[in-house]
Amino acid sequence: MEHIRTPKVENVRLVDRVSCKKAALGTLYLTATHVIFVENAPDTRKETWILHSQISTIEKQATTATGCPLLIRCKNFQIVQLVIPQERDCHDVYISLIRLARPVKYEELYCFSFNPKLDKEEREQGWLLVDLSEEYKRMGLPDNYWQLSDVNRDYRVCDSYPTELYVPRSATAHIIVGSSKFRSRRRFPALSYYCKDSHASICRSSQPLSGFSARCLEDEQMLQAIRKANPGSDFIYVVDTRPKLNAMANRAAGKGYENEDNYSNIKFQFIGIENIHVMRNSLQKMLEVCELKSPSMSDFLWGLENSGWLRHIKAIMDAGIFIAKAVSEEGASVLVHCSDGWDRTAQVCSVASLLLDPYYRTLKGFMVLIEKDWISFGHKFNHRYGNLDGDPKEISPVIDQFIECVWQLTEQFPCAFEFNERFLTHIQHHVYSCQFGNFLCNSQKERRELKIQERTYSLWSNLWKNRADYLNPLFRADHSQTQGSLHLPTAPCNFTYKFWNGMYNRFEKGLQPRQSVTDYLMAVKEESQQLEEELESLEERLEKIQKVHLHGTKVKSKQSEPSKHSGFSTSDHSTANTPQDYSGNSKSFPSRSPSQGDEDSALILTQDNLKSSDPDLSVNSDQESGVEDLSCRSPSGGEHAPSEDSGKDRDSDEAVFLTA
């Protein structure tokens, strides 16, 4: 709070950048974690909350006659324009937000003060939801070819790798350590994904320190061990995700790529994904296009093309597709690396795994995938997403691009993914929000030193608790798209890359449909489920009525037999055979007939009993058709749609028995 110069400013206006609506007048509050704007309108009192950690840039614009404008751009692509009456207040807010948006210590981040009112046990259980040891068991590991290695115990070989890693059984500790010394940042080849049916694998590492002629026997033996761990193939692919020109330039610095003359039985492949600096500039250009007010279609498309953003998305997808096809169609193992093995390598390994394994296309599996290929393998979350004050040149939208690749796949295969677009945008939001501890720091080692799991909460448990909000209504476990690998079309023209309006313009309400396709389909699905439940209830009721009618027929036949053979008289005081007793008030219906035994008395039901035994299904609904009505209906309650038999007398079937 010591960084807040002015905690409250009144008569601030919030400008709607898309529509021509009048700016909302309200009060601006600065807290230790949020910027809050509260409208003055008594009928709405709408609030706009912005986390300090979400703020990307703050721009103080030239003072106008109406006040001093302040433009806040957020990392989740929200843009807020405020007009503050006094220039001094605007300057105080500006200086305060500059400091609050760039904390210098992890303890200043929101996750260390966030308290969702869960006890210690619930917090611990939340961190146990995603268990990577269980994930490797699901892959069929360990087996005859791969083993769990403790060579990196206490992070003594590579401080950016996890402590538990799977390596080929034939790779000794000496080979692993020797290979690590020949790799940038000591990130030696380790297993990322394993296909237990074909024994093909995806491994990852950093670039070798080969320069123009250097070689390392242990590194060559390591790659040979990966090849031998797949008896179905006599070679492995080595995929360098960088443009070849960039990789060659690294050779001059003593790094580079594998020399095929030194490594036996490898096939080398360059992909051509640009570095973090190119990606950062590309995103900036695309966002400038998104900020244009009422651009023409040609201007928007030209700006989007000029940014190169979708070309970069395609390059990442191409790399993932190449690796997935090598594993699924050729049965070959693949080693993937870029420069340091924590940016482009994470992107393409996770895209390939997503294409290969339907488990990663489920809600739980996608969390496991991010935990495995991004969090545990040392993606630099702090540096790439600016959690703390640091070098702005290190910031780059690496995981944003991966999330967009997943969205592009959901558009191409709408029935293959259990989760919807909202799930992806919420993950992207929390990468930057620092509300949970999952995406803090640059490595597993740093997170353990900071005791993240003891001091913060897990995002995965929060998403899992609210998983009903993230379900894809088109997903079916028995659909062909959910079985095995996703096979993308070979012709480039058959795969369409789209601008993701739901991500980059999701806060511009004027550019969004009134109801998303996902919400509409979920409403239709709920309506269908409700109708199915009503149908099932009607069928059960019909079956019950038929049973009652059958028992009534038996009772009638038993009553007629004694009257024929026993010679019972029909005196005036015989209540059982008096017609008016059957047609009168149902409450006066005798509970037992003199002509019946005890065992038959239970078969005689009153109208009240019949009515109370089943719900009234003839209640008509005055709902109008439409999505809004569909979305508010619930199978467990609320109004019901009129059924076909709603106009009939609901007691007509019972009356047949009562007249008998």
From Swiss-Prot:
Biased composition (Basic and acidic residues): 641-653
Tissue expression as described in the entry: Highly expressed in brain (at protein level). Expressed at low levels in liver, kidney and testis.
Keywords: Coiled coil, Cytoplasm, Hydrolase, Lipid metabolism, Membrane, Phosphoprotein
Protein name as annotated: Phosphatidylinositol-3-phosphate phosphatase MTMR7
Disulfide bond annotation, renumbered to this chain: none
Primary location class: cytoplasm
Activity regulation description: Interaction with MTMR9 increases phosphatase activity.
Membrane topology summary: Peripheral membrane protein
Domain Myotubularin phosphatase: 126-504
Coiled coil segments of this chain: 514-548
Extent of Polar residues compositional bias: 566-596
GO cellular component, one term: cytosol
EC number: 3.1.3.64
Summary of subunit composition and partner proteins: Heterodimer (via C-terminus) with MTMR9 (via coiled coil domain); the interaction enhances MTMR7 catalytic activity. Does not homodimerize. Interacts with RAB1B (in GDP-bound form).
PTM annotation (Phosphothreonine): residues: T578
Biological process per Gene Ontology, one example term: phosphatidylinositol dephosphorylation
Gene expressing this chain: Mtmr7
Organism (species): Mus musculus
Molecular-function GO term, any one: inositol bisphosphate phosphatase activity
Subcellular location: Cytoplasm; Endomembrane system
Top-level taxonomy: Eukaryota, Metazoa, Chordata, Craniata, Vertebrata
Catalytic residues in the record: C338
UniProt family annotation: Belongs to the protein-tyrosine phosphatase family. Non-receptor class myotubularin subfamily.
Pfam families, per database record: Myotub-related (PF06602), PH-GRAM_MTMR6-like (PF21098)
Reaction(s) catalysed (UniProt annotation): a 1,2-diacyl-sn-glycero-3-phospho-(1D-myo-inositol-3-phosphate) + H2O = a 1,2-diacyl-sn-glycero-3-phospho-(1D-myo-inositol) + phosphate; 1D-myo-inositol 1,3-bisphosphate + H2O = 1D-myo-inositol 1-phosphate + phosphate
Binding site for a 1,2-diacyl-sn-glycero-3-phospho-(1D-myo-inositol-3-phosphate): N250, N275, I276, S339, D340, G341, W342, D343, R344, R384
InterPro entries xref list: MTMR7_PH-GRAM (IPR036003), MTMR7_PTP (IPR030572), Myotubularin (IPR030564), Myotubularin-like_Pase_dom (IPR010569), PH-like_dom_sf (IPR011993), Prot-tyrosine_phosphatase-like (IPR029021), Tyr_Pase_AS (IPR016130), Tyr_Pase_cat (IPR003595)
Record region (Disordered): 550-660
